Amino acid sequence: MNIRPLHDRVIVKRSEVESKSAGGIVLTGSAAEQSTRGEVLAVGNGRILENGTVQPLDVKVGDIVIFNEGYGVKKEKIDGQEVLILSESDLMAVVE
């Protein structure tokens, strides 16, 4: 995949979610939730501050993150793979 996000943008591949309930029932449609976790595939250079300096991002390629899938999250298909493009501010945590 050849993509370079700009500024404070991050490219994330959503993690797969278990499609069975704890009782073994296969979940489909709206019952099968989409994960809000994923792996960071690419990061931008950083956020440009008012004084013109660039503040580097706190996440790096390979981090597993929990994100808020809100208004600013863009879904794209790149090389047949669905990815999410979001701002670092849409990330809520890094799983360590």
Swiss-Prot record:
Keywords: Chaperone, Cytoplasm. Pfam families: Cpn10. It is found in: Cytoplasm. The keyword Signal does not apply. Coiled coil: none annotated. Its main location: cytoplasm. GO terms for biological process: chaperone cofactor-dependent protein refolding. CDD domains: cpn10. Transmembrane segments: none annotated. GO terms for molecular function: ATP binding; metal ion binding; protein folding chaperone; protein-folding chaperone binding; unfolded protein binding. It comes from the Bacteria. GO terms for cellular component: cytoplasm. SUPFAM superfamilies: GroES-like. Belongs to the GroES chaperonin family. NCBIfam families: PRK00364.1-1 (NF001526), PRK00364.1-2 (NF001527), PRK00364.2-2 (NF001531). Together with the chaperonin GroEL, plays an essential role in assisting protein folding. The GroEL-GroES system forms a nano-cage that allows encapsulation of the non-native substrate proteins and provides a physical environment optimized to promote and accelerate protein folding. GroES binds to the apical surface of the GroEL ring, thereby capping the opening of the GroEL channel. Heptamer of 7 subunits arranged in a ring. Interacts with the chaperonin GroEL. This is Co-chaperonin GroES. It comes from Shewanella loihica (strain ATCC BAA-1088 / PV-4).
